[in-house]
Curated annotation (Swiss-Prot):
It is an enzyme of class 2 (transferase). Involved in mRNA degradation. Catalyzes the phosphorolysis of single-stranded polyribonucleotides processively in the 3'- to 5'-direction. Belongs to the polyribonucleotide nucleotidyltransferase family. This is Polyribonucleotide nucleotidyltransferase. It comes from Rickettsia peacockii (strain Rustic). Keywords: Cytoplasm, Magnesium, Metal-binding, Nucleotidyltransferase, RNA-binding, Transferase.
Amino acid sequence: MFNEITKSVTWNGQVLELSTGKIARQADGAVTVKMGNSVLLCTAVVANKAKEGIGLLPLTINYREMAYAAGKIPGGFFKHEGKASDREVLVSRLIDRPIRPLFHPAFVNETHVTCSVLSYDPETPVDILAIIGASAALSLSPAPYLEIVAASKVGLINGEFVLNPTLALLKTSQLDLVVAGTSGSVMMVESEAHLLSEEQMLEAVKFGFESFQPVIKIIKELAEEAKKPKLEMQALYPASLKKEIEKLFVKEIEQAFAIKSKQERSTNLDLIPEKVLTHFVSDIENKKYSNYQIESALKAIESDILRNEILEKNRRIDGRSTTDIRQIACEIGLLPSAHGSALFTRGETQSLVSTTFGTSLDEQIVDSLEGEYKERFMLNYIFPPYSVNEAMPMKAPSRREVGHGKLAWRAINPILPNKVQFPYSIRVVAETTESNGSSSMATVCGSSLALMYAGVPIKAPVAGIAMGLVKEGKNFAVLSDILGDEDYFGDMDFKVAGTSEGITALQMDIKISGVDFKIMKVALEQARLGRLHILEQMNKVISKPNNELSKNAPSTTTIKIDKDKIRDIIGPSGKVIKEICETSGAKIDISDDGTVSVYASDRDKLKVALDKIKAIVVEPEIGEIFNGTVVKVLDSGAFINYVGNKDGFVHISEVSGERIETVSSVLKQGDIVKVKLIGFDNKGKAKLTIKNADKDKSSNNTKPKTHVNNTKDNSEPEQRRDSSKKRAWNEDNNAEIAEVITERKYFN
């Protein structure tokens, strides 16, 4: 029934298996990828008809993580997979980027690639397996997919490169790098690094590139046996058409490109297509040429003009040389109510960034195949239509926005303080208010400025720069700080972020059949010089974090209590902690280890919450004096709430130094009285006295006194508390509330 074909290779000590012919046989290409206990199904479907006139390849990549792959049922009200998570969006983009440039330029058929994780093994990199599976599925399909791609993940642990490190190993790694490419060149790089040098990054890319070559071999072997006939492709446009357009319109195009302002240049360039189509209207009616062919030829001419200016004259469309950086302007603190803010402008690209502090309760909860975890640092990148003067409605974050935000997150995350050094959760929002290239790197620069102004003790300022490439044969030019048009018509988008000491994030996308390591080395060094220049400009405005947080930032403190006291603070069904939060206006977060974090908008609210917590967790000791509240009066005595939620009993004989007939003649419910703890009965219930309590030094915080119980009840041994026992409240953390409350200084 099945004509299954399987190819396998031992890769990094594990067997990687690719098979086709058993599952999803009606898809144009379908490959099952197995490694360890991970199983992925990758399919490719190609539409029969071309979709002309859209100006780009209609390729859609969908990566899905099925909950059952990890033996889980999806959370939420609807128990099925919903919209794509950020993780799924990011991996979908990771698959798309090395694959998209390798289709025939004239191919415009709708193409859908789906990669589903059916079984999950945390010891294997499923994102890497998805890239491999997608490449294999396309190789089997009719799509004119010109070269085969594979990928690998690289870590750096104890100075050694590690191939496809596990999730556990990545936690100790200085590098998390994904490399994808063909048998001859690198197509895509994505990484987060902890201040690595350019040389280390280049060596890591080489290591990853060499590591996936055996995988390309088995994909080729599988395709040779199982591939379907490829679609025959024609040239995108006749060469004669391009020559005719050049002859008639090249001067006008050159004049438009000579305009340095983006808006004016775009306006003039947008007028040309209509003139060209009008000139060829009879040829279009006679079906000699199509609109799409004419527009494609025109775009090719525009590309040639821009590229020739750079390669032959070392001149870019805004007049800069290949290494020049656009003019930079930095401003901080422009949003008075925000905890931190900055405006970073580089040429016609601008990012408005704000920083907000929250509590551990504000951390982002992420549900993944590995399990649920929290993200303390959040960075949201927003790209509104007005930033490029487009009249469009604002929508939910696009895949591009999610991807750019994650790149900026990777750049900033390595230099943030840990939770002990800085107990807040942090949200950064970067809104691109103008865009003409490299908006994600403007986000990195603006985020660094806003964090420093907000008082976050980051390790060092971070800047980012986007590099471009124009390559014709062996001749090439690497461009620093690229414009939007240079990105569109160029061959590479190479983004590097880091401090003056090293790289924190790297992303490379290629539009041609790949680049060699010589070009990458030049690009990395040129990016380093550009990054240092940008940092120099940023440092003129702010070079280190402010010593104090904004007055709008919440106050916070963290204390330690005995773990067995956690339930007392929480109370039945959360009643106690809810009451503390409501009456104080503070937020409280309690960890399983007894760490209690208290957050409030001001010091007074924080003190109220701390006092209430102290009253609950304090271990009362014999001889201490308390201000108590009468809660119930009986004939034999009275129950008095003397600290927190603790009640004690005052016998009628301990109510007064004089004989009384009834307790109610002296005490009434709600009365505030001074009481002394004199012991505990055999059930651990507190015994209190009012006699002579007001003559002793009265304080709810007096030092514990040794007290010998003088109760007349000798039927049971006295159950006394050891006066040397430490309180559940850690006094070192509470020397004085004013010292505990943050003074907005977090520097050692």
